[in-house]
């Protein structure tokens, strides 16, 4: 793609947008960087690009921003029904999403993972499996390292393992992974995608350009994910925790097996997998399937599963103070993710929950308390909504506390906990009402836990 001298507007100046600006500048494009937020809010983000020859625009979108623009590259945070997108379509200006734009530069094969929950763990785990073959691998995408950096650096015989979100899949056109994978689909981001059906269909776009000699790996146990198989033009490879499969990855007699064309091979005994929890077994099956189909040996897969310690902010053990264990699950940004965290812990739980309202319902989340959650500390926009749902299911009002800050919530949780209990931050909500992102929320939680020792 020849961009020298072309006028390119980058919409949205988060992590992806900053990366796009840097790469476009290096390609000698004339870059316009736009964000609807004001400069003061973004000042910190813009430090690394303010010295580049970029034309910055901030605040409410104006049609004149698009004057003479040849191409618009959208960051994932910019909705497709926004004014800038509508105006670009009216003016017939080429519009590419960040992932689509990056894909067009890629020389290396991309192995793409999506799903509502488990994406980051599965992507990181698969990345480790590739690394353990001795090959050069880039782990990128929604995981924090922008895909545009990975494709610019990766050579033809390297690998790119990419976590892809629904926001990124919304704008793909030609994007075609070598192998794709959908771990699961449960309601999320309905404030953006409007209906669950629309959200499901966007997730299914991950394999829409793959052909009959390529694979998509789908969760056989999740009816919503499995229903997408009928849309696939490529081969479908299932994984299951519950069923024996003639062709796919499955559990038999306490071990993971993978069968391709009827030839089954044992991979590992489940008890040897380092990271605990049923949800992590699902992640292990998904990553192992993609790795095996790409030619990685059972030995390398097994050794990685024995040593991989999980990812930050996902049921991450933080500390034990006076017999109370603290876990950071800030990545629990929807009810289903937080249900899995509650199920993974085997002790009584003091739960810190609440945050930005994405339009989620909390009935199943509250039902999962099931006698395990002894106290509920609520923060953020959804605090009252979760409280009302908890009361609907007869959760004792005396066991519900409110906190104005996460630091206050940690103190209240510690005061409510006894020796042998766990304090779990698993908000079941996004972080954007109080924090820049879930990583910042997780770091503040860990800092607040450390303060308890002082």
From Swiss-Prot:
Belongs to the MurCDEF family. The gene is murD. Disulfide bonds: none annotated. It holds the Pfam family Mur_ligase_M. The keyword Transmembrane helix does not apply. Keywords: ATP-binding, Cell cycle, Cell division, Cell shape, Cell wall biogenesis/degradation, Cytoplasm, Ligase, Nucleotide-binding, Peptidoglycan synthesis. One of its GO terms (cellular component) is cytoplasm. HAMAP family: MurD. Pathway: Cell wall biogenesis; peptidoglycan biosynthesis. NCBIfam families: murD. It catalyses: UDP-N-acetyl-alpha-D-muramoyl-L-alanine + D-glutamate + ATP = UDP-N-acetyl-alpha-D-muramoyl-L-alanyl-D-glutamate + ADP + phosphate + H(+). One of its GO terms (molecular function) is UDP-N-acetylmuramoylalanine-D-glutamate ligase activity. This is UDP-N-acetylmuramoylalanine--D-glutamate ligase.
């Amino acid at each position: 793609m020849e961009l020298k001298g072309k006028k390119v507007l980058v919409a949205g100046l988060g992590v992806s947008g900053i990366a796009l600006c840097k790469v476009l500048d290096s390609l000698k494009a004339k870059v316009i960087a736009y964000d609807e937020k004001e400069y003061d809010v973004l000042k910190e983000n813009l430090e690394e690009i303010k010295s580049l020859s970029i034309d910055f625009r901030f605040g409410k979108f104006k049609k004149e921003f698009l004057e003479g623009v040849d191409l618009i590259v959208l960051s994932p945070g910019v909705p497709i029904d926004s004014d800038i997108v509508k105006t670009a379509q009216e003016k017939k200006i080429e519009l590419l999403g960040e992932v689509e734009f990056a894909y067009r530069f890629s020389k290396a094969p991309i192995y793409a993972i999506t799903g509502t929950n488990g994406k980051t763990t599965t992507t990181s785990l698969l990345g480790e499996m590739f690394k353990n073959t001795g090959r050069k691998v880039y782990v990128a995408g929604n995981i924090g390292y922008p895909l545009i950096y990975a494709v610019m650096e990766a050579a033809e015989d390297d690998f790119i393992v990419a976590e892809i979100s629904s926001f990124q899949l919304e704008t793909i056109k030609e994007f075609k992974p070598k192998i794709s994978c959908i771990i699961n689909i449960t309601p999320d981001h309905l404030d953006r995608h409007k209906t669950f059906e629309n959200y499901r269909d966007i997730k299914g776009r991950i394999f829409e350009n793959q052909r009959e000699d390529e694979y998509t790996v789908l969760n056989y146990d999740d009816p919503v994910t499995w229903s997408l198989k009928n849309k696939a033009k490529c081969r479908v490879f299932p994984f299951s925790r519950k069923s024996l499969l003639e062709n796919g990855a499955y559990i038999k007699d306490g071990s993971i097996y993978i069968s391709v064309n009827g030839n089954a091979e044992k991979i590992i005994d489940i008890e040897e997998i380092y990271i605990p929890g049923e949800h992590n077994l699902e992640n292990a099956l998904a990553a192992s399937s993609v790795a095996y189909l790409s030619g990685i040996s059972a030995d390398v897969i097994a050794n990685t599963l024995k040593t991989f310690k999980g990812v930050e902010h996902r049921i991450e053990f933080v500390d034990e103070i006076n017999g109370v264990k603290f876990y950071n699950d800030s990545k629990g940004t929807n009810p289903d993710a937080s249900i899995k965290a509650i199920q993974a812990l085997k002790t009584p739980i003091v739960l810190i929950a609440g945050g930005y309202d994405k339009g989620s319902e909390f009935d199943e989340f509250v039902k999962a308390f099931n006698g395990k959650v002894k106290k509920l500390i609520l923060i953020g926009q959804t605090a009252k909504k979760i409280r009302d749902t908890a009361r609907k299911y007869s959760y004792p009002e005396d066991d519900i506390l409110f906190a104005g800050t996460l630091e206050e919530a940690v103190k209240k949780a510690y005061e409510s906990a006894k020796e042998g209990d766990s304090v779990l931050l698993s908000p079941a909500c996004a972080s954007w009402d109080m924090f820049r992102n879930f990583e910042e929320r997780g770091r503040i939680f860990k800092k607040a836990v450390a303060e308890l020792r002082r």
